[in-house]
């Protein structure tokens, strides 16, 4: 007998993250942001570096988390990804103390270039030739 695939709890890949995935991702984002703000890491590459956690996406089984990170005012986040990968076990341990889940997710860091792109677009919009076109009255 075939089971009903439309029942709640069974999700296809095209529907997007579940409410549980979103809730766990947001909780994880808050915990990571707090750790990055309050912890001095032993890794010399991360000494004095301020990391911003922009977004966290959870896998459907909640065992993997993709963490999108950036640095405010800097575009060199790619060079810190290996150091973030090295401290991932420490971060998992710290997160595990307060996370009420069966498994603490594996952390996979990715650069978040959205802020860099927004800054670039803002600079383009404030160029003199663009400002001239924006301030020119309509001639129809």
From Swiss-Prot:
Record's subcellular location: Cytoplasm
Disulfide pattern: none
Keywords assigned: Cytoplasm, Ribosome biogenesis
Protein name according to UniProt: Ribosome-binding factor A
HAMAP family: RbfA
GO CC terms: cytosol
Classification via PANTHER family: RIBOSOME-BINDING FACTOR A, CHLOROPLASTIC-RELATED
Organism: Acidiphilium cryptum (strain JF-5)
Protein role: One of several proteins that assist in the late maturation steps of the functional core of the 30S ribosomal subunit. Associates with free 30S ribosomal subunits (but not with 30S subunits that are part of 70S ribosomes or polysomes). Required for efficient processing of 16S rRNA. May interact with the 5'-terminal helix region of 16S rRNA.
Organism ancestry: Bacteria, Pseudomonadati, Pseudomonadota, Alphaproteobacteria, Acetobacterales
GO molecular-function term, one example from the UniProt record: ribosomal small subunit binding
Main subcellular location: cytoplasm
Gene Ontology process terms (BP): maturation of SSU-rRNA
Subunit architecture: Monomer. Binds 30S ribosomal subunits, but not 50S ribosomal subunits or 70S ribosomes.
Region (Disordered): 1-23
Family of this protein: Belongs to the RbfA family.
A UniProt-annotated Pfam family: RBFA
């Amino acid at each position: 007998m075939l089971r009903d695939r439309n029942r709640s709890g069974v999700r296809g890949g095209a529907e997007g993250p579940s409410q549980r995935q979103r809730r766990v991702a947001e909780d994880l984002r808050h915990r990571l942001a707090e750790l990055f703000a309050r912890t001095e890491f032993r890794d010399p590459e991360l000494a004095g570096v301020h990391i911003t956690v922009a977004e966290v996406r959870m896998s459907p089984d909640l065992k993997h988390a993709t963490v999108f990170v950036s640095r405010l005012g800097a575009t060199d986040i790619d060079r810190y990804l290996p150091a973030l990968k090295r401290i991932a076990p420490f971060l998992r341990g710290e997160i595990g103390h307060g996370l009420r889940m069966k498994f603490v997710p594996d952390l996979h860091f990715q650069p978040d270039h959205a802020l860099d792109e927004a800054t670039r677009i803002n600079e383009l919009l404030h160029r003199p030739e663009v400002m001239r076109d924006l301030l020119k009255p309509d001639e129809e």
